[in-house]
């Protein structure tokens, strides 16, 4: 169906979001048009503000509005342990269980030979720099239980073990193919408590 240009552009914008097909984009566009002017202005303001004010922590790579982030600058956290995650959303999931008190490192992706993503394409270089300049004795690999997550964890294990750093992996409370951000808090707690050495 042919829509007026402003609606067509809005549909196109929404359809660029992950998991949003043309039907959902159309629904969102029409819903947005039906919102009050104040709500639309607030939505647009918040979207622009998030894009403008957020950055990645120069230490851990987590999405933050401070650099370095509040976790990296918290001296009460365990400085000897780093939990390595694929995405900033995974940090939020781990923080919600309130049982892990170490540091984080966000990779912004996983090694994926099938997709042409090599170790140089993810945030590994800064992890290696952190490990050389710190007192870290354990790295917990908390990548998703997928082929790419496994490839990344094995790569990290082979890279870090010769340096004398203990490398562990979250326990298998997480289902194969499951994303950490969608796991419930009890599952995440059990996974971190029962992590295994690689």
Swiss-Prot record:
Q: Which stretches does the record call C4-type zinc fingers?
A: 57-72
Q: Which terms in the Gene Ontology molecular function aspect does this entry carry?
A: DNA binding; zinc ion binding
Entry's InterPro entries? DNA_Rcmb_RecR (IPR000093), Rcmb_RecR (IPR023627), Rcmb_RecR_Znf (IPR015967), TOPRIM_dom (IPR006171), TOPRIM_RecR (IPR034137)
List the SMART domains hit by this protein, alphabetically: TOPRIM
Q: Which PROSITE patterns match?
A: RECR, TOPRIM
Tell me if Zinc is a UniProt keyword of this record. Answer: yes
Q: Which processes are annotated in GO (biological process)? A: DNA recombination; DNA repair
Q: Where is the Toprim domain?
A: 80-175
Which UniProt keywords are present, listed alphabetically?
A: DNA damage, DNA recombination, DNA repair, Metal-binding, Zinc, Zinc-finger
Query: What highest taxon heads this organism's lineage?
Result: Bacteria
User: Which Pfam family, just one, is annotated for this protein?
Assistant: RecR_ZnF
Signal sequence bounds: none
Q: What SUPFAM superfamilies does this protein's entry cite?
A: Recombination protein RecR
**Similarity comment:** Belongs to the RecR family.
List the NCBIfam families hit by this protein, alphabetically.
recR (TIGR00615)
**What does this protein's UniProt record list under function?**
May play a role in DNA repair. It seems to be involved in an RecBC-independent recombinational process of DNA repair. It may act with RecF and RecO.
User: What's the name of the protein?
Assistant: Recombination protein RecR
């Amino acid at each position: 169906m042919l829509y007026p240009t402003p609606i067509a552009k809005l549909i196109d914008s929404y359809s660029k979001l992950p998991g949003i097909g043309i039907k959902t984009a159309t629904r969102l566009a029409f819903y947005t048009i039906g919102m009050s002017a104040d709500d639309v202005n607030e939505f647009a303001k918040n979207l622009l503000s998030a894009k403008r004010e957020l950055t990645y922590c120069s230490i851990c790579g987590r999405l933050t509005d401070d650099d370095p982030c509040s976790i990296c600058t918290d001296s009460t956290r365990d400085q000897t342990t780093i939990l390595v995650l694929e995405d900033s959303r995974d940090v939020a999931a781990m923080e919600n269980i309130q049982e892990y008190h170490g540091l984080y490192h966000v990779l912004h992706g996983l090694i994926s030979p099938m997709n042409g993503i090599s170790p140089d394409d993810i945030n590994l270089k800064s992890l290696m720099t952190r490990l050389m300049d710190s007192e870290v004795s354990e790295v917990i690999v908390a990548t998703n239980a997928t082929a790419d997550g496994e490839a990344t964890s094995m790569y990290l294990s082979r890279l870090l073990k010769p340096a004398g750093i203990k490398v562990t992996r979250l326990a298998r409370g997480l289902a194969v193919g499951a994303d950490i951000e969608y796991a419930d808090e009890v599952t995440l707690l059990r996974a971190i408590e029962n992590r295994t050495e690689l």
